[in-house]
Amino acid sequence: MKFGVTLSNRGVLVGLCTTSDLLKLADAVEASPLMDSVWCGDALFVNRRLDALTLLAAVAGRTERVLLGPACMGSFGLRDPMVFAYEWASLDVISNGRTRLVACAGGGAGPLWEAETAAMGINPDDRRKHMVENMHVLRHLWTKDNAPFEGRFVKFSNITLEPKPIQNPCPIWLATNAERLSTGQADSGGSEFALTRVGKIADGWMTHSVSPGGFRRSWDFILKVGSDQGRDMSGFDHVLYHHINVNGDKDAALADSKTFLDLYYTANYSKERLEAWLTYGTPRDCIEHLQRYKAAGCNRVTFRISTMGDPMTQLKRVTEEVLPFV
């Protein structure tokens, strides 16, 4: 398996860490032979945090090896795709071709989400449609010069974007989940359509809060969709977005993670919700839990270090006591 760390860029706003802490954590990932990627969350006006693009650019400037991406780009459907295409292409150049863009629709229920969407001039019902069209805009600008584009929301002609990304094609993954929505509620039927979209148009897949069995079923479904479309899925990649807390006392590990995640997301997570999103307990507990995902075909995991303690100390335990034995 391959492993990465998801930086807690919202933590800077809620007093859980400093910007320096995040960059030191990225340095530690770069230095670890067991890890190969650095990720960070993304949102605009709900679940506010340091801007993902800016933070990833900062990490790119001090690393040479690790892959870089959002987990996931929740604001993707809200951003101007022409400007974003330019920004992401620049990040790919700065990082020497190490980016993994993970698009997702983002959003949720409630007045704050509605206000965010309205402020960006987008109909909430069209958020996913914007996401898909934005993917097409990015690919168009990254691979063509002076070619017209005629979409539902975006239209242009005689536009050439430079710099182009170093990667050709520059990968765009999609984030979706077959078992839970981002709110943690049981999915009501849209997941099969979302997984079909991954298999048809994405270059990779990110998921979270999914059981090993659910991961296997979703992964097989995506690969079949892609193959049925005539796509070569041999290089199609994925990542499980997860949390981890290593502690000799399993109950203490769960309590520590709950305190962290409740503060981080301004929530009150149930034990069931936490256990869907978290590897925790003794090193042996964590090893066995991750081995179940490995047996289900999961070959890449990115962890948020979910502790109220020192994340560097926790990362040391993860890399020394858990990952070598998975």
Predicted features along the sequence, with ranges:
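N-terminal beta1-alpha1-beta2 module of alpha/beta enzyme domains
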Residues: 1-67, 125, 168-171, 181-188
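Flexible, glycine-rich active-site loops centered on histidine and acidic residues
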Residues: 2-17, 77-150, 212-220, 308
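Conserved, mostly hydrophobic/aromatic
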Residues: 3, 59, 91, 138, ...
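Hydrophobic faces of well-ordered beta-strands that scaffold small-molecule active sites
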Residues: 3-7, 36-40, 68-71, 99-103, ...
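Short, acidic/polar
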Residues: 16-31, 84-87, 180-197, 282-292
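Acidic (Asp/Glu)-rich catalytic clusters
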Residues: 27-32, 56-65, 88-99, 197-200, ...
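Glycine-rich, proline-tolerant flexible connector loops at the mouths of alpha/beta enzymes
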Residues: 37-62, 74-75, 107, 209-215, ...
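Alpha-helix-loop-beta-strand connector modules within alpha/beta enzyme cores
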Residues: 50-73, 130-134, 316-326
